[in-house]
Amino acid sequence: MDIQATTGKGFLHKSAEFVSPGHPDRTADGISALVVETHVRHNPAAHVAAETLLTSKGPIIMAGEITSAYHISPDGYKALARDYIRGLGWTKDFGYDPDKIEILVLYNSQSTDIAQGVEKGRKKIGAGDQGITTGYAIRKHWLPFNEDDLMPLPLVLARNTLFGIDQLRRTSKIGKVLKPDMKSEFIISYNSRG
């Protein structure tokens, strides 16, 4: 998230935050992506609109519309979510036990209205009402400058700080006390001279 504000005295304050993979927002996105990837890997013609809702204390709600020749039982979806959460480093000691967290699975078949709008017989004619938009910076060796020069400084600092802390959490003793849910925020004040 990037926020910009002025104080009216010639200063501009730019703020950016970055969250770790264990933060509820990214955990929910990761579980949804895993459901989509699992279906598409086994059935490339699958239609999957998977959503996940969770908080830092639970429960987890997995819902959406799925039409796929590959069947996953409700317990199978729960296992995907539990394994994903466990892989992020969540444990009973951190208060988010992957084996005990309540998970509610509410997937239905894709709406026939949407199916009629995207298929004609076996021929696909559209993508339905779902889409993904992604924005990111990429590294190009031929650029005459560092790609971080293209990103807002508060975002670069928030991202790099959290990457470093998360790496320490995964590889050192600090991981025994530092939970996977982390957020960093930087606020940079600029004056008229920059």
For each feature predicted by the language model, list its residue ranges:
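Glycine-rich, mobile lid/loop segments that gate access to catalytic sites or pores
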Residues: 15-19, 57, 79-194
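Conserved acidic
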Residues: 23, 27, 73, 153
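Short, charge-patterned binding micro-sites
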Residues: 50-69
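Short, conserved charged micro-motifs
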Residues: 69-77, 145
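Glycine-/small-residue-enriched capping loops at alpha/beta junctions
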Residues: 26, 69-71, 88
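N-terminal, positively charged regions that mediate nucleic acid binding
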Residues: 1-49, 54
